[in-house]
């Protein structure tokens, strides 16, 4: 079976559906790959690189399976009967294309119709592209912004950090929060789902909650329209933040519907001159009033509104690699025997949800898939408290007295040469107990390095005793070497793992 990789005819599309790395992975599944000449040129993948990876440079329309980024509307007539077309077909917003595909004896799978379930995460193109878009949105904002993101104290004065507001904490929003925070900005984020608050805080952002009485949970994995009460409360929050922040990044999208308006023209008018807004929903109408899809607009009060619709395509090499990997994961699912034979199983909810047309038969829309329905709250059962017997702690003075008496008796019975060692040993125990007991728990792992050195001394001392005494001395020396060696090697292993947490691979 042959897989063909199309070159997108749109001059603004720089991505490609396969890279040399993914071509090698497809070959391991038993497929032959044909790449259209120049398909990866805009993403820095030459035809020679594809050929070295095992692909053939030729006509992809004669292949059994055709990979594409966007639907090849002008080339559908050239697809052979029985061809399987796989790409971002956007069936929710392109009913005309769906009808056109259904009139042809082909099978069409849409990569942007993958259900939001954990088993399908490796195929989720929307998440892959949203991750790139969120990162690129911060890069575009930094390019248009006239100041540092991070605060600085210099000889010329103090530079305040930039304040960034991210509307929506989905995949794109979280990527934007992480990128802006890594540049040193003060990041705030809003989202109608209160459960994402911990994710925002884990990336160093501040979660701004919209206090509303009717926050609902979507059962599809995608955003949903909110109530008028929520929208009114959110509008007041956005209005307050617009006067304060320097950069706003909006990510709110509702599948199959125009993007909701979050930032009005009045809010934009209150923003400071030089502020930047990146509207990531510009392709669907925009979250910001005044956004022009594909263009940059500067308002009368000096606010820059960026409405780029190709943010993932502005990182073409990375976007192509992630998209190609999503396709490879799909082919692994469709090729269970790794024999180069595509098997489409409609009993699999993932494959069923992606299939728009099967052998010329319309299969869109698929049955709904519930992926995140909130479980019903269970009333807590009353638990009868059973009294636990209280153990009286030992008297510290009694314990100290017994220990002192035992030490005194041991010292009195010991040889004179041993008394000094016992005294030092007892003092070391007391001092070590109080020193280690007051060390913060987070520093216990670094203390392993110190204990390695102490255990090493024990090993050396035990080695010196081997062969210089009776069987008892030799036996105790062997036990000491064994136990101390476990501490030494274990300590170094833990220390290595600890240091690896602070290094970049």
Q: Model regions: which residues?
A:
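Adenosine-phosphate binding glycine-rich loop
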Residues: 112-114, 118-156, 161, 282, ...
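Small-residue-rich segments of transmembrane alpha-helices in multi-pass membrane proteins
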Residues: 453-463
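An N-terminal-biased, well-structured beta-alpha scaffold segment characteristic
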Residues: 5-100
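ADP-ribose/adenylate-binding Rossmann-like module
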Residues: 81-112, 247-306
């Amino acid at each position: 079976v042959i897989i063909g990789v199309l070159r997108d005819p749109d001059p603004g599309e720089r991505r490609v559906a396969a890279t040399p790395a993914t071509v090698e992975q497809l070959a391991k599944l038993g497929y032959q790959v044909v790449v259209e000449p120049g398909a990866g040129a805009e993403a820095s993948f030459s035809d020679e690189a594809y050929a070295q990876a095992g692909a053939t440079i030729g006509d992809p329309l004669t292949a059994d399976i055709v990979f594409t980024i966007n639907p090849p509307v002008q080339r559908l007539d050239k697809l052979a009967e029985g061809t399987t077309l796989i790409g971002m077909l956007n069936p929710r917003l392109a009913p005309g294309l769906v009808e056109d595909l259904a009139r042809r004896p082909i099978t069409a799978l849409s990569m942007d119709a993958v259900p939001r379930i954990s088993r399908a995460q490796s195929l989720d193109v929307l998440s892959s592209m949203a991750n790139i878009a969120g990162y690129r949105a911060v890069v575009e904002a930094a390019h248009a912004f006239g100041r540092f993101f991070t605060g600085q104290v210099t000889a010329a004065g103090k530079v305040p950090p930039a304040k960034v507001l991210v509307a929506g904490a989905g995949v794109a929003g979280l990527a934007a929060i992480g990128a802006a925070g890594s540049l040193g900005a003060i990041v705030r984020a809003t989202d109608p789902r209160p459960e994402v608050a911990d994710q925002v805080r884990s990336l160093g952002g501040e979660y701004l909650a919209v206090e509303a009485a009717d926050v609902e949970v979507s059962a599809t994995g995608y955003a949903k329209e909110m109530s008028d009460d929520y929208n009114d409360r959110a509008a007041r929050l956005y209005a307050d933040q617009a006067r304060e922040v320097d950069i706003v990044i909006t990510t709110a999208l509702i599948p199959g519907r125009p993007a909701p308006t979050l930032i009005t023209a009045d809010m934009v008018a209150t923003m400071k001159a030089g502020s930047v807004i990146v509207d990531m929903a510009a392709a669907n109408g925009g979250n910001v009033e005044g956004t022009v899809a594909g263009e940059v607009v500067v308002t009368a009060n000096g606010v820059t509104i960026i409405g780029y619709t190709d943010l993932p395509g502005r990182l073409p090499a990375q976007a192509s690699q992630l998209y190609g990997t999503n396709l490879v994961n799909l082919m692994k699912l469709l090729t269970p025997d790794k024999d180069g034979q595509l098997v489409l199983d409609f009993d699999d909810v993932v494959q069923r949800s992606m299939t728009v047309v099967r052998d010329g038969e319309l299969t869109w829309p698929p049955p709904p898939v519930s992926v995140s329905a909130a479980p019903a709250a269970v009333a807590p059962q009353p638990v009868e408290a059973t009294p636990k017997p209280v153990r009286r702690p030992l008297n510290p003075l009694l314990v100290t007295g017994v220990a002192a008496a035992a030490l005194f008796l041991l010292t009195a019975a010991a040889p004179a040469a041993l008394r000094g060692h016992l005294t030092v040993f007892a003092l070391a125990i007391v001092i070590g107990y109080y020193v280690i007991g007051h060390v913060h728990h987070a520093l216990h792992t670094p203390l392993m390095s110190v204990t390695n050195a102490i255990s090493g001394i024990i090993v050396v001392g035990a080695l010196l005793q081997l062969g210089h005494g009776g069987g008892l001395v030799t036996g105790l020396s062997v036990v000491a070497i064994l136990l101390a060696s476990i501490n030494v090697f274990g300590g170094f292993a833990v220390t290595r793992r600890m240091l690896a947490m602070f290094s970049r691979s």
